[in-house]
């Protein structure tokens, strides 16, 4: 089995583009079987055992990565397909339908996550530490709903630029 990670730097906690990155990552591969990476590499081609992406804001920086596990003979094709999805997000603005689908998916994930008391307490504690305010998930989602397809594409071009992406194979 081969493990592959692609990633780059992204925004710190509180950055104005943090929520845009959060939504963009969710579309790409964050936490859902309807993400682009999952649908392509797992469902369509059956190349990976698992695949996801995450965007992690830290106090002074942040990082974003894709992780996948596959058979060694599939790693090159998997890398090619990952880069294809990144390029598509850089080059093509989401349609209104795609945007609404992404927002509905994220809203459902946030609502389900809020039902977990431990997750909720940890998220609220982090918010209090960094912002001295712990908004309900609905307040955060209302801000996410203001994100435009153009803003998503701008962040994709900034964060997913090929020259900024590092690759780790092990």
Describe these PLM feature segments.
Residues 1-35:
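His/Glu-based metal-binding/catalytic segments typifying zinc-dependent metallopeptidases
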Residues 5-11, 42-91, 96-147, 164-170:
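M16 family metallopeptidases and their MPP-like homologs
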Residues 27, 127, 131, 159:
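Conserved catalytic core of Hanks-type protein kinase domains
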Residues 153-169:
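Bilobed periplasmic-binding protein-like "clamshell/Venus-flytrap" ligand-binding domains
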